[in-house]
């Protein structure tokens, strides 16, 4: 009769054998790694093949571990480079697909994703302030031409237009907000045209209709103009209906919206009420990091009100416009409102990540992207009325008004002549845009024209 062993004894013996085998394998593998590390450390200590470094590395365990840590650094660096390269390749691939869709006439639609939600929890305002501090650091004189030329190659900037030699820009911040040589941006002299206030790409343009005044951010999503300019905006929106009801509604709207400013500027209300009915138009222009960053006046006009909205600082690139709702309404911005010879005009300078600082030349004391005292502030936008005794501040066509610390977006909203003609007919006095979506424009270039009747 064969002896029988208990089942648990068999499994215990099997488990003990596996443990001894695994321990032996780990010890062999550890010895192999230690040899590699010691050889690598010896090669670094003695490039010509000295044996002392290798012998020391193969010695005590503590010394081997301390020198072995250096072996992990190149691997981590290489992994980081590969990861960044993969992300960049993916971005280039997606951009290429977007360009192919545009060439085929396919318009991109709004599509929110999880990345946009993740951006909402990041401290983008603090990051932008830290970035601004870094960009303000002084660069050694000998290094400045190399740094600025590298930036120009990366973002396609024209250094020949810079007003000063590259050595005179003490920091990247000074270089970004540089002025241009005289005559680099000729201003269209036609009195019946509105010129571009910035260098950039035309994203959207058109006529505002209805009482809500919606601007299409991207196909499938729009944002409200009153939300962009503020609830106290002087915007003369017209409700849909017959011409007579339109005139009455506009009169009521003007009485309410202009009441606050008219108390301080009686001449302002007289000019607005005396001006004829006009169409309301908009134009959205995006500035890339390599573009000229100063904002100029699009026409001769009087700025009467300035509002500063301390909002978020989401990025405003093409990907962000397709994934973040109400992007321009959510972001920090400075709005200038006033009148010109054709009626209402507003210029909204919208900030973005690392571009929270917007400076006004007409109000140097204004500071944007300041630390918030509350986590979720509910206070209204900061507002200032210019020149309460008169018609506001006079801004001449083509003159510098403000500056972005990098690139961002400008939204221009204005009234222009519209002929009161039956539907389906045209008139030479109508305002017409002379740019197309996606066009590159420069300061002083005409955005649209009309003819005097």
From Swiss-Prot:
PTM field: Is synthesized initially as an inactive proenzyme. Formation of the active enzyme involves a self-maturation process in which the active site pyruvoyl group is generated from an internal serine residue via an autocatalytic post-translational modification. Two non-identical subunits are generated from the proenzyme in this reaction, and the pyruvate is formed at the N-terminus of the alpha chain, which is derived from the carboxyl end of the proenzyme.
User: What is its pathway?
Assistant: Phospholipid metabolism; phosphatidylethanolamine biosynthesis; phosphatidylethanolamine from CDP-diacylglycerol: step 2/2
Signal sequence, renumbered to the chain: none
Cofactor names from the entry are: pyruvate
List the expressing tissues: Expressed in roots, leaves, stems and flowers.
Q: E.C. number, please?
A: 4.1.1.65
Could you identify this protein by its name? Phosphatidylserine decarboxylase proenzyme 1, mitochondrial
- Recorded source organism is Arabidopsis thaliana (Mouse-ear cress)
């Amino acid at each position: 009769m064969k002896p029988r062993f208990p089942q648990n004894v068999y499994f215990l013996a099997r488990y003990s054998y596996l443990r001894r085998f695994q321990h032996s394998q780990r010890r062999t593998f550890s010895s192999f790694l230690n040899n590699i590390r010691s050889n690598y450390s010896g090669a670094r200590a003695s490039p010509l093949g000295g044996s002392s470094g290798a012998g020391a590395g193969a010695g005590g365990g503590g010394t081997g571990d301390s020198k072995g840590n250096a072996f992990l650094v190149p691997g981590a660096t290489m992994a980081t480079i590969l990861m960044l390269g993969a992300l960049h390749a993916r971005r280039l691939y997606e951009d290429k697909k977007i360009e192919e869709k545009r060439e085929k006439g396919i318009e991109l639609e709004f599509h929110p994703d999880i990345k946009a939600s993740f951006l909402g929890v990041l401290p983008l305002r603090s990051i932008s302030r830290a970035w601004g501090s870094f960009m303000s650091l002084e660069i050694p004189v000998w290094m400045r031409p190399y740094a600025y030329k590298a930036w120009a190659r990366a973002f396609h900037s024209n250094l020949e237009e810079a007003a000063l030699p590259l050595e005179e820009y003490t920091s990247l911040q000074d270089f970004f907000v540089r002025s241009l040589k005289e005559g680099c941006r000729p201003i269209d002299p036609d009195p019946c045209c509105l010129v571009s206030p910035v260098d950039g790409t035309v994203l959207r343009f058109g006529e505002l209709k209805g009482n809500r005044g919606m601007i299409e951010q991207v196909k499938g999503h729009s944002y409200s103009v009153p939300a962009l300019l503020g609830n106290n905006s002087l915007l003369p929106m017209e409700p849909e209906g017959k011409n007579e009801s339109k005139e009455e509604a506009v009169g009521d709207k003007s009485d309410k919206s202009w009441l606050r400013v008219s108390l301080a500027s009686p001449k302002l209300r007289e000019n607005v009420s005396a001006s004829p009915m006009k169409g309301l138009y908009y134009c959205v222009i995006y500035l890339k990091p390599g573009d000229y960053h100063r904002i100029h006046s699009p026409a001769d006009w009087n700025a009467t009100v300035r509002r500063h909205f301390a909002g978020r600082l989401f990025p405003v690139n093409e990907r962000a416009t397709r994934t973040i709702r109400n992007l321009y309404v959510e972001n920090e911005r400075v709005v200038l409102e006033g009148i010109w010879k054709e009626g209402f005009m507003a210029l909204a300078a919208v900030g973005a990540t690392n571009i929270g600082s917007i400076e006004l030349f007409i109000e140097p004391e204004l500071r944007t992207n300041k630390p918030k005292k509350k986590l979720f502030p509910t206070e209204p936008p900061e507002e200032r009325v210019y020149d309460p005794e008169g018609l506001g501040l006079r801004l001449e066509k083509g003159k510098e008004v403000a500056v972005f610390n990098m690139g961002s977006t400008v939204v221009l909203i204005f009234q222009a002549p519209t002929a009161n003609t039956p539907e389906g007919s045209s008139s030479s006095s109508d305002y017409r845009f002379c740019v197309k979506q996606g066009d590159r424009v420069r300061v002083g270039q005409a955005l649209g024209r009309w003819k005097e009747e």
